[in-house]
Regions:
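RNA pseudouridine synthases
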Residues: 1-179
Length: 179
């Protein structure tokens, strides 16, 4: 499996999870998961987090997301990391390459409930979301139920590729872990 170990000591490992890799085995994807890698690499030495399918895993990344994932190697580090993620002491920042320039369309969304422009051109979206009742893989904004999602976006660079085609490098800070 194509998983790079970026850092490792006696307490934890930081892994670079590639995009399109499922973290936990599911019915449609039993092999090639991050859990499969962890079981192969560390055998039975990782602490069990919640159940046997989370060996050392204290947070998650979606299948389509590449990035760093922290794996606890001891019960003590697992407890500490889980506490830090729950209390939001860990800052989660992603980079995304987007089609177009989000700043050009802000007038269409600024002022809608939960959408605010903060200083330094930071766009904050703070609203409740829930799973779409028809397509359970999608999330939707809702007003009276769901769970709070807080995300902040900053356009880092806009690449003008000509012929009215632009790409933007956007920094995304996910405060709640829900998007």
């Amino acid at each position: 499996l194509d998983v790079q170990i970026v850092f490792e000591d006696g307490s934890l490992a930081v892994l670079n999870k590639p995009a399109n890799m499922v973290v936990h085995p599911v019915k449609s994807s039993q092999s090639g998961t991050l859990v499969n890698f962890l079981i192969f690499k560390y055998r039975d030495t990782l602490p069990i987090i919640y159940d046997k399918f989370r060996p050392g895993i204290v947070h998650r990344l979606d299948k389509d997301t590449s990035g760093l994932i922290i794996v606890a190697k001891t019960k003590l580090s697992a407890d500490s990391l889980i506490k830090q993620f729950k209390s939001r002491k860990v800052k989660k920042v992603y980079l995304a390459l987007c089609i177009g320039n989000p700043l050009e369309n802000l007038s269409k969304i600024i002022g809608k409930p939960g959408i605010n422009m903060l200083e330094d051109n930071i766009l904050e979206i703070k609203t409740n979301i829930r799973r779409n009742k028809i397509n359970r893989e999608m999330m939707e904004v809702c007003t009276n139920d769901g769970r709070l999602a807080i995300s902040r976006f900053t356009v880092q660079t806009v690449y003008d590729l000509g012929k009215n085609y632009k790409l933007s490098l956007v920094s995304c800070e996910i405060e709640t872990g829900r998007t």
